[in-house]
């Protein structure tokens, strides 16, 4: 992992406010189940986090930020208009965190924006934002 190769590397995660199972799990010190969850970032919507994944998050992820649905839509729109990228909601989470000024930026900062499986109606909604 990057942390093994260079322990000073900071790794951050981003989750939608409406489905922040790993944020709540970290807060409670154990994997939890949410009562309700929803987000346009449907690839990361989980009531319960993945049991196999949680220990890796605890070990390697320095912090997890949450972003709003408005920011996710704005990130999809920004990527499309200025980056010529079509991103689904989940793929736009890192950019949404940057737009909300939640990501600490320094030289060498990398944002991973991956995933373009977005419904045309959802993309149209984002483009109207």
Model-derived regions: residue spans:
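PLP-dependent amino-acid enzyme catalytic core
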Residues: 1-129
